[in-house]
Design a protein with these regions (language model features):
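Metallo-beta-lactamase
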Residues: 45, 52-53, 115-117, 139, ...
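Hydrophobic/aromatic beta-strand patches that form the interior of the parallel beta-sheet core
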Residues: 24, 76, 100, 132-134, ...
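Active-site HxH/HxHxD metal-binding segment of metal-dependent hydrolases
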Residues: 53-58, 62-141, 145, 166-170, ...
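Short Gly/Pro-enriched turn/cap motifs at secondary-structure boundaries
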Residues: 26-28, 129-131, 151-155
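Positively charged N-terminal leader segments that act as targeting/secretion signals
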Residues: 1-15
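Conserved beta-strand hairpin/beta-sheet module of binuclear metal-dependent hydrolase folds
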Residues: 21-68, 161-168, 172-174, 178-181
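Short acidic-hydrophobic surface loop/beta-edge motif
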Residues: 16, 26, 38, 137-142
Length: 238
């Protein structure tokens, strides 16, 4: 959870292209969640935290998927705080996919109404339950894209990061940096809050130091809120 800029925030749409992988970023809902659409050249797509919260955001996401002839294969959540799950029901119903997240965050799905009242964040439709649980060492794959699951508790008990160790070539160059999608575990110059529903700052800092900071310095980090950063840049804060 991270402070947003209000309900009139525009749906932005940054696009990155790395060999066989397209990365489309939308900023959605009043809390400014970064939603990512990863796809290969064959049109297989992975959605990370697609927390669209109104018709305008749903239409922007749908339009991108349809215009690029994508087939959604996976619906992933880095964690299950309300601001990251607002679009789960829409995506699951429209594209026929199941929610995939860590089982230690499953209890948060029973607290959606409580979270909605706490943060004043309207919930159009509750998220469905977990369809597939992800744990440390698992991998989520479509041809040409492999995301390794890294479990880092502390922001939430079941917080996970998705690590792409080998994104492939760019313009024939093989030295392409790894990619990390840590949700609210790690931000540019900061980390996630730990005062919500089972949070633990000691566990969060420990997990970041043990599991994320040892990654290559040039790893590009796409956080759950805010701008991109690198692991090398974040090491100075720890």
């Amino acid at each position: 959870m991270f402070k947003g800029e209000g309900p009139e925030r525009k749906v932005s749409g940054l696009l990155f292209y790395i060999n066989n992988m397209n990365i489309k970023q939308f900023v959605v809902n009043p809390f400014g969640v970064n939603c990512f659409v990863l796809s290969n050249d064959a049109g297989d797509a992975i959605l990370i935290d697609p927390s669209v919260s109104n018709e305008r955001e749903e239409e922007a996401l749908t339009r991108y998927i349809e215009q690029n002839h994508l087939t959604v294969r996976h619906l992933l959540n880095t964690h299950l705080h309300l601001d990251h799950v607002l679009g789960n029901a829409f995506v699951a119903r429209k594209y026929g996919v199941q929610l995939e997240a860590h089982e230690e965050d499953a209890f948060l799905l029973d607290l959606q109404e409580e979270q909605s009242q706490m943060f004043g964040l309207p919930m159009r439709e509750p998220s469905p339950g977990l369809g597939n649980t992800l744990a440390e060492g698992d991998a989520v794959e479509v041809p040409g894209i492999r995301l390794q699951v890294i479990h880092v508790a502390g922001h939430s008990p079941g917080g996970i990061a998705f690590y792409c160790e080998n994104p492939g070539e760019v313009n024939g160059q093989k030295n392409v940096p790894p990619l990390l999608f840590p949700g609210d575990i790690l931000f540019a110059g900061s980390r996630g809050r730990s005062d919500l529903f089972g949070g633990d700052d000691h566990a969060l800092v420990s997990g970041i130091k043990r599991k994320l900071l040892p990654l290559p310095d040039d790893t590009v980090v796409f956080p759950g809120h805010g701008p991109t950063t690198t692991i090398g840049d974040e090491k100075r804060w720890y």
